Amino acid sequence: MKEKTKRKLRTFVCLLMIPVFLTGCRIKTTPLGVFAQILEYASASGSSSSQSSHHGTYHSEPASTPQPQIDYDSLGDIGTVQTIMIYMVGSDLESSYGNASLDMDEMEAAGVDTAHNNVIVYAGGASQWQDRGLDGDACTTLLLTEDGFAPLDTYPAENMGDPLTLSSFMNYCFDFFPADSYSLLLWDHGGGPVLGYGVDENYRDLLTLDELSEALADSVGAHMTKLEWIGFDACLMSSLEVASVLAPYADYMIASQETEPGWGWNYAFLSVLSDRAIPGDEMGEYIVDSYMDYGEYVFDYYPNLYSDLTLSCIDLNAYAEAEDALNTYFAELDTSLDVQNYPKLVRNRAKVRDFGSYSSDMNYGMVDVLHMLELLGDNSDTAKAATRAVESCIAYSDTNMENAGGISICYPYQTDEDYRDACIEMQEYLGFAPNYTRFLQDFYAIQNGDTLLADREISNAHTTVTTENDGTYDESDITLQLTPEQQANFASGGYYILCKAKEEGYITSEEDPRADEMYLFIQGSKRVTLDENGVLHAAYKNNALYMEDDDGVSDIPMILTESDISDVENRYLSFVVLMNFDNWESQAAKLQIAVNEDYPDGIIRNAIPLSDDDDVQSASKQLIRLDDYANMSVAARCSYVTRDENGDLLDFFDWETSKWMMGFEVDLTSDYRTVVQ
């Protein structure tokens, strides 16, 4: 660290243009690589009594229905108004963090009217339980009583990623806990409609949408009834594809478009249960409001645990009309799709609100349906009709995000090709909006282009610099004039900022003879626009973000990627390693940092743990308190300028890497903060 001084980096800007129909596509993608492993969970489950398929693990014999081992008379009257079934897949959320146990504590503290309502939890899927006295090698059914949870039965662990396990639990509840209405709550990780819900830690399995459909058909469908609501206390599950699966079996869906923080739902909502059956839309409003209120309460006390929040109650009885209207709109859009209008379509797609990519390690391709229709629809009659139909099925929703209307759809863009194909396969299997699926197929058929790089130093690029009225930072508009052909083919772009390691004093020629060729990555962004004159604009604030603690300001900037485009702030990700010296525990994490009018020097919103488990790609619900750690390390490797055989500059990420790592440490026990210089 050093004394704080005003400084400017000597930087180098690379502008990237992505045209759209040249051969040899080299568009950057979000690494996925493990999707095939997810589809092959069945073969890795280690269960000798199961049969494998890419749809999951199925028992060769139906799962046995657990029989209660409790004196019902000792519990008082069994409620007849409402039965809420909670399928709690503990996963690492319980084994590592105890979140399932904490939520069960919340349920007990809610003061549920157990005389008229049944709340039954099926708990399993975790390698160990932090509390509650539950066994990681077993599954347990518990009934909420006025004295807390009472175990009904414990038996050897079933695979909670098996649809038979879920249907068996629900049939058990139908048989032993009859009521006027039933609801189902699915608790755990979520991965959106492509990956599905729940991660059984013991069997390495999850429930895909086709498996969820199978489980509901074999339980709700078999009993010729309909659930009042189905809720996901899980990430990324408020989507039209999920709604299509649930619509035959429930009146309402309650779920989040975005990832959820580790604390998940606020189970104080159970206190509203009474001697009347509460309609699903009314209960949905209770659940949404309690979730949002608790989140704001947490953020007031722990600003470094800030998260984007969304929660919606979807009217599944209005779903069919929404799908039909959307299907009609995309039939029209697909007819007009060609290589001439494709670039404009891609530019608009890049602006649509994405979910999950800012708060996880993946690009899930989940976009807000209403925002998508606004940007892609060109104000057409079919787009307006689709918008009205989608709005009509959103019974209630709330959020602290921009452009989060309540329900999403999977529209992969710049994702792994396997993930993209899996999205289409999923939609085809479900019979979901076939014209939309056909549009995606045609969209990807055109998406065969080559990446054209235009690299220019700031000093040579056309730059305008103005000073804000408060004088806190400078604004640079870095521009690049495109040729007519480039303009016609331009789809999307990005830029990254490099600094010269030697000129910044990070390295000397004595330490490395190639020091003059060495650059350090500082910042990357997709905040690039094309104006009506064919000029590409990259808005770069002519400064960088540093860390400051009691020892001063860091020698090098934070390494930032702007992965979420917001109209009200700049949002960055930065990879760090956290350390506790007492037990030498370390945790790789991703900081979410925001710079806005309220925080011109930036603020660390939260820290998300990075999993070392390559098999599991569901979105992380857990957040890290930086105050629980003593030290934070930031490091990046320098690279040498590298050109191809024709002398053309390669993409920075294809440059030759050096042996030199540049970095710094931050004392988290001190008064640390971010600063912009």
Where are these regions (language model features)?
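Catalytic-core segments of thiol-dependent peptidases
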Residues: 123-224, 234-236, 240, 257-258
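N-terminal extension/subdomain marker
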Residues: 39-178
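Bacterial signal peptide processing site
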Residues: 26-28
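Structural recognition of the beta-strand scaffold that forms the well-ordered cores
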Residues: 83-88, 118-123, 182-186, 228-232, ...
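Bacterial N-terminal signal peptides that target proteins for export
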Residues: 2-13
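C-terminal motif of bacterial Sec signal peptides marking the signal peptidase cleavage site
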Residues: 21-24
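Terminal, contiguous helix-loop blocks that mediate binding/assembly
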Residues: 44-77, 193, 197-232, 237-677
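Composition-driven recognition of long, low-complexity, acid-poor segments enriched in small hydrophobic
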Residues: 5, 31, 35-38, 42
